[in-house]
Amino acid sequence: MDIKHILSMVDHTLLKPETTWEQIKGICDDAMKYHTATVCIPASYVARCKAYMQDRADKVGVCTVIGFPTGYSTTEVKVFEAADAIKNGADEVDMVINIGMLKDGRDDEVLAEINAIKKACAGHTLKVIIETCLLTEEEKIRMCDIVSKSDADFIKTSTGFSTAGATFADVALMKAHMTNGKGIKAAGGIASIADAEKFIEPGATRLGTSRIVKIIKNEEASGY
């Protein structure tokens, strides 16, 4: 698979709590050099990141996260976070569902929350993180149905901050049950170009990772 095609599907991600501005600038530079889909960064850096890339011909999208990583903020707080992120220049928003709400069987409320957040970032891409490692197969299928019915643009496997990240089986399950042309983002544990290819094969259309760009940089430095 063409490496440029893989890179075009990558949200080049840095969400560690100790992240500094120098590190953010570094991933922006890498993302622009290698033409990734976006940089995915903490909301507190969105405005500075957008300004940093503003006059660059090879700028990429800015993605951030809300309700992250637990998802149990109130809907009102998540809506505010989304609106604030868009105001500051975010092009894409990745939200975490209220997992307890899903497990309680309150599917209509999960759907309503997604749509309220999408309304707050209308005209911009919304991805819905369902944290697959905490869900049963039945719950994953229900979330596929909810996201398919919603106004969101993508379903996403994982935050990368829970007990496990994306699996090939989960991406295949999403591909089998998603409808309405929604995208599928795999995130968490994508450690190599081979991993990326294996997630794309069953249906991933976006990849959340920082490692692929690092691997390519290391190969270039080694003369490969």
Located regions from the model:
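Alpha/beta catalytic cores of nucleotide-metabolism and tRNA/nucleoside-modifying enzymes
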Residues: 1-29, 116, 173-184, 190-224
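Conserved anion-binding
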Residues: 77, 82, 92-152
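Active-site cofactor/substrate anionic-group-binding motifs, chiefly glycine-
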Residues: 37-44, 48-92
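Catalytic cores of alpha/beta
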Residues: 50, 70-84, 135-146, 169, ...
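Structural motif
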Residues: 34, 88, 120-121, 146, ...
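Active-site mouth loops of central-metabolism enzymes
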Residues: 5-21, 63-78, 100-106, 127-139, ...
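Glycine-rich phosphate-binding active-site loops on the catalytic face of alpha/beta enzymes
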Residues: 64-68, 87-102, 149-165, 186-224
